[in-house]
């Protein structure tokens, strides 16, 4: 059974006019390596820690500024949200299609809330806590191309023509602000699009971005702004002592107009200085150490890296399944070809390297979790190839071969072909990222040993489910297994309304 909404009734939960307050018993374990009777052994000790959560239930008017607004992802997301808001339908060769949010965790997935008369009861994910309605978002942003959003949508060739015709009147007046362009960080083939750029030194560019954010917020009368990078993949920035390793050095390098500060890092610095959440949707190392330090000092949310939408999402499920089943993956070979502008930019070796790193690290935690299958330091062979094939456009092809060792030296091979509609998969992920980032800023919590409430760590691990290479606080383990990432996000939000984590034991039926 599916229900649209619910309210928790419990002595541990209190709803007021402005907030939801919950008391939550967090059950975990601690391990001790101790000497007992002359021999060291591991002892696991269950423990319970009491937490309190409070969530501000005032849903703000939200502005979303996309870096690369006129790209495939930005134009597709903007058109999709408007189409949903206006209730637009359009004819395809198969049927009359209604606008929807399929592919969005917050808008199109469900959670289990319990059982009733022997039947499982589910509710929308978005019913857990008050979230921004996507159709009330005000969109804006920057682009190095001056093309309006209607023409950008046509250039992208993602949406059906009948839908594009209906969307044009809503989008032709939407024009991105000039963007920061540095040809040293992206492929040379992107130069032909760069007719709409912010001039000046890096510090002047930073100041212009800050000015743009302030003016957007004032003009549109929004309460909050979230900025997300959905522009070209950049090459990796060199992390150098004295350049960007500390906040002080990073800001000094900015004053000196150092060449190694990337455009994405400039946008992120601007957001942190304005206390505006910034999310990196591409694989480059935007968050250099000095920037992470700045975000932590100013308690400003940052998240990333790289949208997890197609091939990598499948990989994080399949490898988790294989290792969890006691099967040993020994080789993972991933081949991609795509024909959109992302593919053209990735045809340059330096930008491809950023994507290769992002895609290659996705299985590390799963391999490291099983010391029966893998010796220390042992790892499957893992190769990632990406090629630019203009003919396929936004319909990225992903082909994977997984070779595994099974019982008694046997071999198992799984071959998968995945046609990933690149922007149609990424757009709802962008939506989820900005909605969850905004929600995160309204939640505070404390443990029984702390004296006051505080926000989550500025490095937003709650967004890991949506990120190919999750950004985590220094010293924090990286989790890539998709089921664990989703469970973490859902269970934290459940705790905010006093619900136990979903453990799937269902003892009442055993």
Swiss-Prot record:
Tissue specificity annotation: Expressed in siliques, leaves, roots, seed endosperm, but not in embryos. Highest expression in roots. Confined to vascular tissue and hydathodes of leaves.
Record-annotated disulphide pairs: none
PANTHER family: MYO-INOSITOL-1 PHOSPHATE SYNTHASE (PTHR11510)
Cofactor(s) needed by this chain: NAD(+)
Cited Pfam families: Inos-1-P_synth, NAD_binding_5
Family from the record: Belongs to the myo-inositol 1-phosphate synthase family.
Gene it is expressed from: IPS3
Protein name: Probable inositol 3-phosphate synthase isozyme 3
GO CC terms: cytoplasm
Entry's Gene Ontology molecular function annotations: inositol-3-phosphate synthase activity
Function (record text): Key enzyme in myo-inositol biosynthesis pathway that catalyzes the conversion of glucose 6-phosphate to 1-myo-inositol 1-phosphate in a NAD-dependent manner.
Reaction catalysis annotation: D-glucose 6-phosphate = 1D-myo-inositol 3-phosphate
Classification via InterPro entries: Myo-inos-1-P_Synthase, Myo-inos-1-P_Synthase_GAPDH, NAD(P)-bd_dom_sf
Pathway participation: Polyol metabolism; myo-inositol biosynthesis; myo-inositol from D-glucose 6-phosphate: step 1/2
Transmembrane intervals: none
Location of this chain's protein in the cell: Cytoplasm
Organism: Arabidopsis thaliana (Mouse-ear cress)
Name of the top EC class for this enzyme: isomerase
Effect of disrupting the coding gene: Lethal when homozygous.
Keyword field contains Lipid metabolism: yes
GO biological process annotation, one example: phospholipid biosynthetic process
Keywords: Cytoplasm, Inositol biosynthesis, Isomerase, Lipid biosynthesis, Lipid metabolism, NAD, Phospholipid biosynthesis, Phospholipid metabolism
The EC number(s) this enzyme carries: 5.5.1.4
């Amino acid at each position: 059974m599916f229900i649209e909404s619910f309210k928790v009734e419990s002595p541990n939960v209190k709803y007021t006019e402005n907030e939801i307050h919950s008391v939550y018993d967090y059950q975990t374990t601690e391990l001790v390596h101790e000497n007992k009777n002359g021999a060291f052994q591991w002892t696991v000790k269950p423990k319970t820690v009491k937490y309190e959560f409070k969530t501000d239930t005032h849903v703000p008017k939200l502005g979303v500024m996309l870096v690369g607004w006129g790209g495939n992802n930005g134009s597709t997301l903007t058109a999709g949200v408007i189409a949903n808001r206006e209730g637009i339908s359009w004819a395809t060769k198969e049927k009359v299609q209604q606008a929807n949010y399929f592919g969005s965790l917050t808008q199109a997935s469900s959670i289990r809330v319990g059982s009733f008369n022997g039947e499982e009861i589910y509710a929308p994910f978005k019913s857990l806590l008050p979230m921004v309605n996507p159709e009330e978002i005000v969109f804006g942003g920057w682009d190095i191309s001056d093309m309006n959003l209607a023409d950008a949508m046509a250039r992208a060739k993602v949406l059906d023509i009948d839908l594009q015709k209906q969307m044009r009147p809503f989008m032709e007046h939407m024009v991105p602000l000039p963007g920061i362009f540095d040809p040293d960080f992206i492929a040379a083939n992107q130069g032909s699009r760069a007719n709409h750029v912010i001039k000046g030194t890096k510090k002047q560019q930073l100041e212009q971005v800050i000015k743009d954010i302030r003016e957007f917020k004032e003009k549109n009368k929004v309460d909050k702004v979230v900025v997300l990078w959905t522009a070209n993949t950049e090459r990796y920035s060199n992390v150098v002592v004295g350049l960007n390793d500390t906040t002080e050095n990073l800001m000094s390098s900015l004053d000196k107009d150092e060449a190694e500060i990337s455009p994405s890092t400039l946008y992120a610095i601007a957001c942190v200085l304005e206390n505006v959440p910034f999310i990196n949707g591409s694989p480059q190392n935007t968050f250099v150490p000095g920037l992470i330090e700045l975000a932590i000092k100013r308690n400003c949310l940052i998240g990333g890296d790289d949208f997890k939408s197609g091939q990598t999402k499948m990989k994080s499920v399949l490898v988790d399944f294989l290792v969890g089943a006691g099967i040993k993956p020994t080789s993972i070979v991933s081949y991609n070809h795509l024909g959109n502008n992302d593919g053209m930019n990735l045809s340059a070796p330096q930008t491809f390297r950023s994507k290769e790193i992002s895609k290659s690290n996705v299985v590390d935690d799963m391999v490291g979790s099983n010391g029966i299958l893998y010796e220390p330091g042992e790892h499957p062979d893992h190769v990632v190839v990406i090629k630019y094939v203009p003919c396929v456009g936004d319909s990225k092809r992903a082909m994977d071969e997984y070779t595994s060792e099974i019982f008694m030296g046997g071999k198992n091979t799984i071959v998968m072909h995945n046609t990933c509609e690149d922007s149609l998969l990424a757009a709802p992920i962008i939506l989820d990222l900005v909605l969850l980032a905004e929600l995160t800023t309204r939640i505070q919590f404390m443990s029984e040993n702390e004296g006051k409430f505080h926000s989550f760590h500025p490095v937003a691990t709650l967004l890991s489910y949506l990120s190919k290479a999750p950004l985590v606080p220094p010293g924090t383990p990286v989790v890539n297994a998709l089921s664990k990432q989703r469970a973490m996000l859902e269970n934290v939000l459940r705790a905010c309304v006093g619900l136990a984590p979903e453990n799937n034991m269902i003892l009442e039926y055993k």
